[in-house]
């Protein structure tokens, strides 16, 4: 686990990052993807820009405390199918691996001080599942990992997809977040 912090667009993002052991990869990944899988500063830059985008777009909902804060802390773990299956079973009662899990700390009722660092929660991404999904969707792993991270972040910020309409809205926001970094 690596703890790292930096500013991104006037936001301070403190990230507890657990990289995926690249020696466990059974596919070739390009240097950008490899760097993303082991370098927390790449994620800090992305996550900071995504949060800032959400803050300045009034049409996008998130808890008031997030809108008024400039300091955030969260965890991001890149893991394997077994670990995410164990977490999915323990926390959600699902006996299957999944692509991404989010463990939010705040919600609309959260009361905090906006000049303090806001702990958002944790995002866990299964790299083997991301590899399979990237292949199935004719996408590259670089994009798929970011796609899953945006999905996890939106859950940390209060979004949910209990029906098709809310899922569609959430997926559109994910596309917007990736576009601001030029990934699509």
Swiss-Prot record:
It is an enzyme of class 3 (hydrolase). Its cofactor is Zn(2+). It comes from the Bacteria. Keywords: Cytoplasm, Endonuclease, Hydrolase, Metal-binding, Nuclease, Ribosome biogenesis, rRNA processing, Zinc. It holds the Pfam family YbeY. Its main location: cytoplasm. NCBIfam families: rRNA maturation RNase YbeY (TIGR00043). PANTHER family: ENDORIBONUCLEASE YBEY, CHLOROPLASTIC. This is Endoribonuclease YbeY. It comes from Prochlorococcus marinus (strain NATL2A).
């Amino acid at each position: 686990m690596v703890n790292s912090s930096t500013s991104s667009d006037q936001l301070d993002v403190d990230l507890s990052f657990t990289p995926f052991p690249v020696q466990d990869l059974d596919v070739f990944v390009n240097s950008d993807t490899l760097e993303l899988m082991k370098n927390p500063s790449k994620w800090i830059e992305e996550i900071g820009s995504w949060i800032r985008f959400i803050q300045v777009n009034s049409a996008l909902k998130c808890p008031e405390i997030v809108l008024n804060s400039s300091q955030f802390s969260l965890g991001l773990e890149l893991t394997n199918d077994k670990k995410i299956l164990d977490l999915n079973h323990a926390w959600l009662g699902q006996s299957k691996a999944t692509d991404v899990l989010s463990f939010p700390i705040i919600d609309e009722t959260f009361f905090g001080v906006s000049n303090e660092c806001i702990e958002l929660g944790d995002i866990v991404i299964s790299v083997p599942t991301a590899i399979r999904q990237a292949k199935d969707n004719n996408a590259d792993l670089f994009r798929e990992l970011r796609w899953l991270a945006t999905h996890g972040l939106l859950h940390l910020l209060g979004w949910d997809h209990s029906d098709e309409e809310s899922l569609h809205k959430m997926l559109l926001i994910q596309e917007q977040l990736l576009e601001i970094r030029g990934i699509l």
